[in-house]
Curated annotation (Swiss-Prot):
Disulfide bonds join 68-83, 100-181, 161-174, 255-276, 288-297. The gene is CD38. Keywords: Disulfide bond, Glycoprotein, Hydrolase, Membrane, NAD, NADP, Receptor, Signal-anchor, Transferase, Transmembrane, Transmembrane helix. It comes from Macaca fascicularis. It catalyses: NAD(+) = cyclic ADP-beta-D-ribose + nicotinamide + H(+); 2'-phospho-cyclic ADP-ribose + nicotinate = nicotinate-adenine dinucleotide phosphate; NAD(+) + H2O = ADP-D-ribose + nicotinamide + H(+); nicotinate + NADP(+) = nicotinate-adenine dinucleotide phosphate + nicotinamide. PANTHER family: ADP-RIBOSYL CYCLASE (PTHR10912), ADP-RIBOSYL CYCLASE_CYCLIC ADP-RIBOSE HYDROLASE 1 (PTHR10912:SF5). It holds the Pfam family Rib_hydrolayse. GO terms for biological process: B cell proliferation; B cell receptor signaling pathway; negative regulation of apoptotic process; negative regulation of DNA-templated transcription; positive regulation of B cell proliferation; positive regulation of DNA-templated transcription; response to xenobiotic stimulus. This is ADP-ribosyl cyclase/cyclic ADP-ribose hydrolase 1.
């Protein structure tokens, strides 16, 4: 006990006192411990796992709310929708949850709030040819892609994810579906709403496919892995594929492509009829949608 000096004591008084050197050492240790606690308390909550994908789109909450308000103003049938409730449900699907463990169930409250019905024969699916599909529905106003519906419109071209066990949105990085995980907030959202969109389709459903790709029908696309398998045979009489050619000189019959035949087989096995049409000139196709009575539209497009 080299650091203790004994002296007569009574009662509960300490039997020894620390030397000045030991007191200084103890004080320094306590100070270092306090600094470490402060550093951990400040830095740890700010630490974020680095994902391979880009972070949440800037001003994500404001963008979603603004889009919701705009959509409900333009579409009278959706004016009953409370956009704050929509945002709360959207946020609740991913905030504080591990970004690689999101489920379709997480999005069900949002799906219920955004329920819409597309008239029969008016559903347009698409795969790898988004821009032309949207140009088409802008002209043919009585047909609808998923992005023409409330939920698809809210999330179109946006990225989002949260921080596990916090209420923060991660604007630095989000999981990439190839490099990190497929059960991320964005991928699961589109899988969920695409499934619902296909389930509610009826009559003749159309799909626009990109004929310039090596796989015109890709089983791994959202259309090939989700929508095709969720068309309801009791409601859908036929699927009509529009294969869009990539150039004026391409005169091939792409409806005979092996991947299109694969699509036909999948659809036929589900007791849904299948039709296919080549669209050789997409520019003329859109022009003829605008002006169907034009004499040039009487010839093939």
């Amino acid at each position: 006990m080299a650091n203790c000096e004994f002296s007569p004591v009574s009662g509960d008084k300490p039997c020894c006192r620390l030397s000045r050197r030991a007191q200084v050492c103890l004080g320094v240790c306590l100070l270092v411990l306090l600094i470490l606690v402060v550093v951990v308390a400040v830095v740890l909550p700010r630490w974020r796992q680095q994902w391979s994908g880009s972070g949440t789109t800037s001003r994500f909450p404001e963008t979603v709310l603004a889009r919701c308000v705009k959509y409900t103003e333009v579409h009278p049938e959706m004016r009953h929708v409370d956009c704050q409730s929509v945002w709360d449900a959207f946020k609740g699907a991913f905030i504080s949850k591990y970004p690689c463990n999101i489920t379709e169930e997480d999005y069900q409250p949002l799906v219920k709030l955004g329920t819409q019905t597309v008239p029969c024969n008016k559903t347009l699916l698409w795969s790898r040819i988004k821009d032309l599909a949207h140009q088409f529905t802008q002209v043919q106003r009585d047909m609808f892609t998923l992005e023409d519906m409330l939920l698809g419109y809210l999330a179109d071209d946006l990225t989002w994810c949260g921080e596990f066990n916090t209420f923060e949105i991660n604007y630095q990085s989000c999981p990439d579906w190839r490099k990190d995980c497929s059960n991320n907030p964005v991928s699961v959202f589109w899988k969920t709403v695409s499934r619902r969109f296909a389930e509610t389709a009826c009559g003749v459903v159309h799909v626009m496919l990109n004929g310039s790709r090596s796989k015109i029908f890709d089983k791994n696309s959202t259309f090939g892995s989700v929508e095709v398998h969720n068309l309801q045979p009791e409601k859908v009489q036929a699927l009509e594929a529009w294969v869009i050619h990539g150039g004026r000189e391409d005169s091939r019959d792409l409806c005979q492509d092996p991947t299109i035949k694969e699509l036909e087989s999948i659809i036929s096995k589900r007791n849904i009829r299948f039709f296919c049409k080549n669209i050789y000139r997409p520019d003329k196709f859109l022009q003829c949608v605008k002006n169907p009575e034009d004499s040039s539209c009487l010839s093939g497009i």
